[in-house]
Regions:
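Carbohydrate-binding surfaces of carbohydrate-active enzymes
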Residues: 28, 172, 183-198, 205-213, ...
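Short hydrophobic beta-strand segments in globular cytosolic domains
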Residues: 71, 691-692
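Bacterial N-terminal signal peptides
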Residues: 10-19
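Extended substrate-binding grooves/exosites of carbohydrate-active enzymes
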Residues: 36-38, 44-56, 61-86, 93-97, ...
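Extended carbohydrate-recognition surfaces in non-catalytic/accessory domains of CAZymes
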Residues: 30, 38-50, 56-58, 66, ...
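Aromatic-lined substrate-binding rim segments of carbohydrate-active enzymes
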Residues: 88-156, 160, 229-234
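Hydrophobic faces of well-ordered beta-strands that scaffold small-molecule active sites
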Residues: 74-76, 103-105, 141-145, 210-214, ...
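Aromatic-lined ligand-binding clefts that engage carbohydrates, nucleic acids, or primary amines
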Residues: 665-687, 719-720
Length: 772
């Protein structure tokens, strides 16, 4: 139990004070909460939903159910074929340690049958092995089996022989698929191959696969998805949950209960055909009833809306693509703030989300194709370009396994969802009538409540990407419950800090003791085996942490006649004894500690992230070619106004450097090569082979070295950079655009370094891992 590492004091002891000042009379912001209506069920056409141990997955109109209890799944997207097989286990463990409990992954058809009839399931394309590791590390899996995927892959994952086939007419618009028996016969063969890979790894077998997504972003007739479901089951893929994206709107609705729609929302839209700040994305920072982000696929989608209002009362609000990052396209060089993703996720949860899927949670790289490169590009008729190799996505875990700041922000949220998500899933969202639906309105505070009519959580989002948000002074809330009770808090008005986002509980039963409200964010809980309960909270920065308990539920009611104000610190949690004798302990962590808190360990002590001590070593550069000649960035199509990415031949005019790595690098620690540069596009080649590329967005170009060892230690490492042209229309984040010279060009290397953990720390980490 946590208390094995903590000294406790009573509510009148150390580490806290009692608020003695009277509450200031301020008119609270009021929300009337109704009693949730009955859930609907019985119409869902689930597949085999029991595992050999009898654990059952089911669903109703409000939430998923696991083992008879409400279940709030937390899923992270990670594409197995975009990552080396040798690093899968390490990556999946990082995901698990970040609070992820399930992995979603695409099966890109052209990664496995680039040439018709030639199947490739080896190495990084071995789906069976990937699922085995998911099972071994304790992660569920949702497999997005296509046949069309998107994922910024070449032709959305369609092999060229499918995309360019003359056997059937091309679909009339984006979002449709070929309607031809030979096409479906090819899909049937694909599904048979995938089914063989999954054999023995489905939920019914005791395996990790609990769900399958059919196609992606499909907007045609429902009969197509019904055909895919039939083909999947015939191929042996009988799983509890069959899903689809809830966008765009289909020609006709799916038969009820056959397929569950999953939704999405992003912090940026790198696909937009614009070089201005995206206006539509700002709506994702509002609490709202609408589930669909209509900006998704707006580059090509001509069908407005999605299965939203029609399905809102019949399906739970689940997401497949809550954006935890964003790719960098050639014409939109986004650079995300960690809070962009964290507050976006909070907005979705505060709007009623009952299961969250982060896209992408782990970045990757496009594999080498046998015939072509495998990225989305304008050469193939797409409306934007992405990098040839890199699919880093600015994800919480980067392309080379780098841990980024939003990994910690999302982990803090995920810890809460693991321990309390089941309670939250039962609670629908209630939105104040005063909530603005206009994201340009920054004067009205954005808040919502999720409640079961008895208790709940109040969500506040005072953050919006690229929009400074003001503080709100003299704020109190009043939640009026259907039983006549009210939760009015805080006791005294507070200032909601600028650019902040958080949630607070009210009328919460904690081990028989009712927490009337707290101005702190719950993180996780632990039972001590003797009937006691410890609950860990995170402070809301610049807001006093105030806890108010119902005296009638305490053994000594006089102990908390006034609000309890707690100061952050793990050494002295407060301890309360309920009227029934059970013990409740409250621990409050500082902002910093809450972001470094890890899942409880085998010793049941709170464990915090030890941020590694890093060492930087400069890399020797030798200039080989000093060209940097401007290229023609315009499309050959005069109607296409956006710039197009450089082709291989354009790099004949690049400036070129030869890099010499420092000696003695410990490749086991995965040292990172960091290239600080300004320019348009940078490419790194090893013995003439492209190993990574980067569209400049103001961030450092990073390459993990371990996967290229030992070749990279002795081979020729070459860096190519093309100049960025000031006249080229490209979107940059504020402050990210480089400085241009008198000729309107930007090309500069500031420094190149290798960053690695110090060896002593690596040895300590290895010893600790063996001890655990």
């Amino acid at each position: 139990m946590f208390t094995s590492a903590l000294k406790t004091v009573s509510a009148t002891g150390l580490g806290l004070t009692m608020a003695l000042t009277p509450a200031v009379e301020v008119e609270p912001r009021v929300l009337v909460v109704g009693m949730p209506g009955p859930v609907a069920s019985g119409y869902f056409k689930l597949g085999a939903n029991k595992d050999p141990a009898g654990r059952e997955i089911s669903v109703n109109s409000r939430h998923l159910i696991l083992d008879g209890r409400p279940w709030f799944p937390v899923i992270g997207e990670f594409h197995f074929s975009r990552h080396p097989q040798s690093e899968w286990r390490e990556s999946l463990i990082k995901m698990r340690d970040g609070g992820i409990r399930g992995v979603s992954t695409y099966v890109f058809w052209n990664h496995h049958e680039e040439i018709e009839g030639e199947w490739d399931w080896e190495g990084r394309k071995n789906l069976r092995c990937f699922l085995e590791i998911c099972r071994d590390v304790g992660l569920m899996a949702v497999v997005r089996i296509g046949p069309w995927c998107n994922g910024e892959a070449r032709y959305g994952g369609f092999p060229d022989w499918i995309e360019k086939s003359q056997k059937w007419p091309a679909p009339k618009r984006w979002g449709l698929r070929p309607e031809h028996p030979e096409y479906l016969a090819s899909v049937q063969r694909l599904y048979h191959q995938i089914g063989q890979q999954m054999q023995g790894h489905l939920w019914k077998d005791g395996g990790p696969v609990v769900g399958i997504q059919l196609d992606n972003e499909y907007s045609g007739p429902s009969k197509y998805l019904m055909s895919l479901k039939k083909l999947a089951i015939e191929a042996g893929m009988d799983v509890p949950l069959f899903t689809k994206t809830g966008w765009p709107r289909m020609v006709d609705p799916m038969p009820e209960g056959e397929v569950i729609p999953f939704y999405g929302a992003y912090a940026e839209a790198a696909w937009e055909g614009s070089t201005e700040v995206s206006a539509d994305i700002a709506y994702n920072y509002l609490f709202r009833a609408q589930r669909i982000d209509e900006s998704i696929a707006s580059d090509v989608n001509t069908v407005s809306g999605g299965e939203d209002s029609e399905s809102r009362d019949r399906y739970p609000f689940l997401t497949a693509e809550t954006g935890s990052g964003m790719f960098v396209s050639y014409h939109r060089r986004s650079r995300l703030d960690p809070r962009d993703s964290a507050s976006l996720a909070l907005c979705q949860i505060g709007s009623g989300c009952a299961g969250i899927g982060y896209y992408m949670y782990h970045g990757g790289e496009n594999p080498d194709g046998k015939l072509t490169t495998l990225q989305k590009s304008t050469i193939n008729g797409d409306v934007f370009d992405i990098a040839v190799k890199s699919y880093d996505f600015q994800a919480p875990i980067g392309q080379f396994g780098q841990i980024r700041p939003h990994y910690h922000w999302l982990r803090r949220l995920n810890l809460f969802l693991e321990d309390f998500g089941g309670d939250l899933a039962r609670m629908p969202a209630f939105l104040p009538a005063s909530n603005s639906v206009n994201p340009t309105n920054t004067s009205d505070l954005r808040w919502s409540v999720r409640s079961d009519g008895h208790a709940g959580f109040l969500f506040v989002n005072n953050y919006q990407r690229l929009q400074p948000m003001p503080e709100h002074r003299q704020v109190r809330f009043e939640v009026r419950l259907p039983n006549g009770m009210r939760a009015t808090f805080p006791e005294s008005p507070v200032t909601i800090p600028a650019d902040s986002f958080f949630f607070w509980p009210f009328h919460w039963d904690l081990n028989g003791i009712r927490l009337l409200h707290a101005t702190a964010q719950p993180l996780l809980k632990e039972e001590d085996g003797e009937g006691g309960l410890t609950v860990v909270f995170a402070e809301t920065p610049r807001v006093t942490a105030e806890f108010v308990f119902d005296p009638a539920t305490l053994k000594n009611p006089s102990e908390t006649e006034k609000p309890v104000v707690i100061k952050p610190g793990i050494s002295q949690p407060i301890e309360l004894i309920g009227a029934d004798g059970r013990v409740l302990r409250i621990v409050l962590l500082s902002e910093k500690d809450s972001l470094s808190l890890k899942r409880k360990t085998k010793t049941s002590k709170l464990e915090f992230e030890e941020f590694p001590r890093m060492r930087s070593t400069p890399v020797t550069l030798e200039l080989v070619e000093n060209l940097g000649t401007p290229r023609n960035w315009r499309s050959s199509n005069p109607e296409f106004q956006l710039p197009v990415a450089p082709a291989d031949w354009d790099f004949q005019e690049a400036s070129v450097w030869r890099l010499r790595l420092p000696e003695g690098l410990d490749m086991k620690g995965n040292p990172i090569l960091r290239i600080h540069y300004q320019g348009d596009v940078a490419r790194l080649l090893l013995n003439g082979r492209l190993i990574n590329d980067n569209f400049y967005n103001g961030e450092v170009f990073e390459i993990g070295l371990r996967r290229f060892a030992p070749e990279i230690l002795t081979g020729e490492l070459t860096l190519q950079i093309l100049p960025l042209q000031e006249a080229m229309p490209v979107y940059f984040e504020p402050g990210a655009k480089p400085r241009f010279n008198a000729e309107g060009l930007a090309l500069k290397i500031e420094r190149v370094e290798v960053v690695e953990r110090v060896r002593e720390q690596l040895a300590n980490l290895a010893a600790k891992k063996m001890a655990d």
